[in-house]
Amino acid sequence: MWGCGWSRILVLLLLMCMALMARGTYGAYICSPNPGRLRISCALSVLDQRLWWEIQYSSGRLTRVLVFHDEGEEGDDVHLTDTHHCTSCTHPYVISLVTPLTINATLRLLIRDGMYGRGEKELCIAHLPTLRDIRTCRVDADLGLLYAVCLILSFSIVTAALWKVDYDRSVAVVSKSYKS
């Protein structure tokens, strides 16, 4: 009876871990690297040269920041973009924008859609209604997910091993007393 209950718990834990890994972190991760600044990161499976960030303020004003600048083109000093490759992540390319702290704004990562640049496709979106929605930057979103999954899997394996040892001992004791 105990074995059946524990096995169900382990199966549920493993299914939760698989769901987390399959989902990845395709959404946006928002944090504040220092006071007055905001960092938004989006994990993608493919890197493309046609990416840009769009910030829509509550006043209706739009700001667009290219992720990749041409060599002759100057970048924006107020908004900084960053890309890095994460080898252990579900979606290996992390695109980030560091911008002045903005409340009541919507931030989107967009890609030009179509052969001739007509239209756009939204890859990530984040709404910033209050300061409570922003946390301090500690661990990258994908690494945090990876650590959580590893911790859950490790706990599951240790629990299963301990249960197996306990079960084998109880079976051995019962069979010894039954034989005598």
Swiss-Prot record:
Its main location: host cell. Keywords: Host membrane, Membrane, Signal, Transmembrane, Transmembrane helix. Residues 1-27 form the signal peptide. GO terms for cellular component: host cell membrane; membrane. It is a single-pass type I membrane protein. InterPro entries: HHV_UL121. Belongs to the HHV-5 UL121 protein family. This is Membrane protein UL121.
